[in-house]
C-alpha cells in the first residue's frame, strides 16, 4: 500500500539526479547573490499553484532546510477558484504532496468572475490573498516560482507596453503588505524545470484561464521564439540584461 501511495504522489528530494544538483546549485547561488533568505528567517510562504514551477520551488526549498540553511518552516499557499492559475489542479493532489513533505497548506478562494477577468487585476487579487495568508501564519517572506524565462518575458513586455526596461526582480519589499517577495528560481531556465518535473512525475498542464491563453505575455513569448530563430541566446540575454541593467523601481513598491 505504501508503494502505491508513493507512486501516486510525486515527491522530488535528494539524492538528486545531475539535473537536480544543477537546479539546487542555481537556487543556492540566487539566495547568496541576492540575499533572499535574511538572517533569522523562521518561516517562508510559498505561492503554490500546483504547476511545475511552484512545485519545483517547493521541493528545492524543502531540500535546502538544514543543509547550509536553518530549518525554517514552509507554509504553502494555494489560491483556488474557477479561473485561478491553479484551477486545473486537484486539491487532493496538492494536499497529498504537502502532507508527505510535512508542509502546512493554506487554501484561499478567489472570487474572480469570468466577466471580471483581466490578467493584471487577477494577479493583484491572487497576490493579495497570498500575502494576507502568509502574514496570518507569521511568514513575511513569500517565495514565487518565477524563473529565468519569466524574467525575459517581463523585460520585453514592460519595454513594449510601458517603455520601461524592467524585468522580474529577485527580491521585492512590498511595503503596502509588509512582506518581501523572493524569486529563488531566477537563474533557472524553464526547459530545465520542465525536464525536472517530467523526471519526478509532476509535469502537468494547469492554466484554465480563458483570458490567459490570449494574453500580452503569450504574445511576447511568441516574439521571443521568433527572435530565437536568428539569435539563439536572446532569451538568456534578455533575462541577464534585466538583472544587470534593469530598473529597480519595483524593488520597494
Q: Where are the regions that the model predicts?
A:
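Nucleotide-activated sugar donor-binding and catalytic core shared by glycosyltransferases
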Residues: 185
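ATP-dependent adenylation/nucleotidyltransferase module used to activate substrates
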Residues: 2-153, 157, 161-164, 169, ...
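Flexible helical/loop "lid" subdomain adjacent to adenine-nucleotide binding pockets
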Residues: 43, 153-156, 160-182, 190, ...
Amino acid at each position: 500500500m505504501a508503494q502505491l501511495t508513493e507512486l501516486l504522489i510525486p515527491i522530488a528530494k535528494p539524492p538528486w539526479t545531475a539535473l537536480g544538483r544543477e537546479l539546487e546549485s542555481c537556487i543556492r547561488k540566487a539566495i547568496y547573490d541576492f540575499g533572499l533568505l535574511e538572517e533569522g528567517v523562521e518561516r517562508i510562504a510559498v505561492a503554490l499553484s500546483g504547476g511545475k514551477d511552484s512545485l519545483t520551488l517547493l521541493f528545492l526549498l524543502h531540500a535546502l532546510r538544514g543543509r547550509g540553511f536553518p530549518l525554517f518552516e514552509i507554509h504553502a499557499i494555494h489560491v483556488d477558484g474557477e479561473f485561478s492559475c491553479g484551477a486545473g489542479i486537484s486539491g487532493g493532489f496538492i494536499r497529498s504532496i504537502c502532507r508527505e513533505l510535512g508542509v502546512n497548506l493554506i487554501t484561499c478562494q478567489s472570487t474572480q468572475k469570468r466577466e471580471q477577468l483581466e490578467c493584471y487585476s487577477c494577479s493583484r487579487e491572487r497576490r493579495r490573498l497570498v500575502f494576507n495568508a502568509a502574514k496570518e501564519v507569521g511568514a513575511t517572506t513569500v517565495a514565487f516560482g518565477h524563473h529565468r524565462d519569466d524574467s525575459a518575458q517581463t523585460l520585453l513586455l514592460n519595454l513594449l507596453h510601458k517603455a520601461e526596461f524592467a524585468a522580474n526582480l529577485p527580491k521585492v519589499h512590498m511595503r503596502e503588505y509588509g512582506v518581501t517577495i523572493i524569486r529563488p528560481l531566477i537563474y533557472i531556465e524553464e526547459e530545465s524545470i520542465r525536464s525536472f518535473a517530467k523526471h519526478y512525475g509532476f509535469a502537468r498542464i494547469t492554466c484554465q484561464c480563458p483570458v490567459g491563453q490570449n494574453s500580452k505575455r503569450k504574445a511576447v513569448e511568441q516574439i521571443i521564439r521568433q527572435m530565437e530563430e536568428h539569435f539563439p541566446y536572446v532569451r538568456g540575454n534578455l533575462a541577464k540584461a534585466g538583472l544587470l541593467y534593469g530598473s529597480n523601481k519595483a524593488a520597494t513598491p
